[in-house]
C-alpha cells in the first residue's frame, strides 16, 4: 500500500531541528545552476544589444547554439552529480536522527560517474518516449524516478540495471507518485507568492517525503518477490545502518 500521507508526516518529524544543512544544500545548488547559465545570459544580452543588425544577430545565434550544446553536456554532468548527491544525503537523513553536515552531502560527489550516466540515460529514454506523446514521457519519468536512490544506496548496481529496478519497484505505483507530486502543488504556488522563500522549507520536505516513498516501494517489492536483494547488490557500507539493511533485504522485510 502506498501511503503518501504517512511518508509526508514522517518527513516532517525527520526534518525537525535538522533544516540547516538541507537549506545550505539548496543555496549551493541554486548558485551552481546560476553560474553554469551565465554564458547563456551573456550571449542573449549581446543579441539583444545587436538590435536589428541581421548579420550580428545570426552570428550571435550561431555562437549561442554552440554554447548551448556545451552547456547541455556540462548541465547533464552537474545536475546528475547533484541528483545523486541529494539522493544519498536524504537516504542518510532517513536512517539516522543525528544532524548531518554539508560534508555528508559532499560525499555523494564520489558517485559522479553514476550520477552523470544516470541523468544522461534517463533523459534519453524520457525524451524518446515523449516524442511519441507527452503523457508517455511523464509516465516513464515516474517509472525511472527511483533510479538515483538505487544508485546512491547500491553504487555497484549499474545505471541500466538501476533503471530496470526502478521500473520494477514503481510498477503499479506510478499514479500514486504522480498524485504525491500534485499534493505539493499548493505549497509550490504559495512559494511563488513568497518569491521562493518558502522553498527553503518546501524542497527539503518534498525530498524527504519521496525518500520515504522510495524505502516503502523497495521494501514492498522485496516482500512480494518482484525484486530480490541480489538484484540490488551490496549496500554502500558508509550509509548508516547498511549492515541492518542488508539483513532485512535478505529476509524480504521493510528497511
Where on the chain are the PLM-derived regions?
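Hydrophobic alpha-helical membrane segments
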Residues: 1-255
Amino acid at each position: 500500500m502506498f501511503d503518501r500521507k504517512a511518508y509526508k508526516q514522517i518527513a516532517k518529524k525527520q526534518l525537525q531541528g535538522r533544516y540547516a544543512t538541507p537549506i545550505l544544500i539548496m543555496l549551493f545548488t541554486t548558485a551552481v545552476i546560476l553560474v553554469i547559465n551565465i554564458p547563456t545570459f551573456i550571449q542573449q544580452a549581446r543579441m539583444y544589444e545587436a538590435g536589428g543588425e541581421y548579420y550580428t544577430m545570426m552570428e550571435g545565434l550561431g555562437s549561442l547554439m554552440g554554447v548551448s550544446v556545451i552547456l547541455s553536456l556540462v548541465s547533464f554532468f552537474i545536475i546528475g552529480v547533484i541528483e545523486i548527491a541529494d539522493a544519498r544525503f536524504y537516504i542518510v537523513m532517513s536512517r539516522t536522527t543525528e544532524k548531518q553536515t554539508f560534508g555528508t552531502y559532499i560525499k555523494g560527489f564520489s558517485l559522479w560517474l553514476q550520477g552523470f550516466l544516470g541523468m544522461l540515460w534517463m533523459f534519453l529514454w524520457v525524451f524518446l518516449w515523449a516524442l511519441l506523446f507527452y503523457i508517455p514521457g511523464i509516465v516513464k519519468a515516474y517509472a525511472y524516478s527511483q533510479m538515483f536512490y538505487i544508485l546512491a544506496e547500491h553504487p555497484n548496481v549499474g545505471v541500466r540495471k538501476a533503471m530496470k529496478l526502478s521500473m520494477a519497484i514503481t510498477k503499479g505505483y506510478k499514479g500514486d507518485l504522480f498524485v504525491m507530486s500534485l499534493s505539493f502543488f499548493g505549497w509550490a504556488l504559495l512559494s511563488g507568492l513568497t518569491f521562493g522563500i518558502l522553498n527553503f522549507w518546501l524542497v527539503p520536505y518534498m525530498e524527504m517525503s519521496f525518500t520515504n516513498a522510495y524505502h516503502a516501494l523497495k521494501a514492498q517489492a522485496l516482500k512480494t518477490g518482484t525484486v530480490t536483494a541480489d538484484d540490488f547488490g551490496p549496500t554502500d557500507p558508509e550509509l548508516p545502518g547498511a549492515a541492518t539493511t542488508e539483513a532485512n533485504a535478505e529476509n524480504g522485510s521493510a528497511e
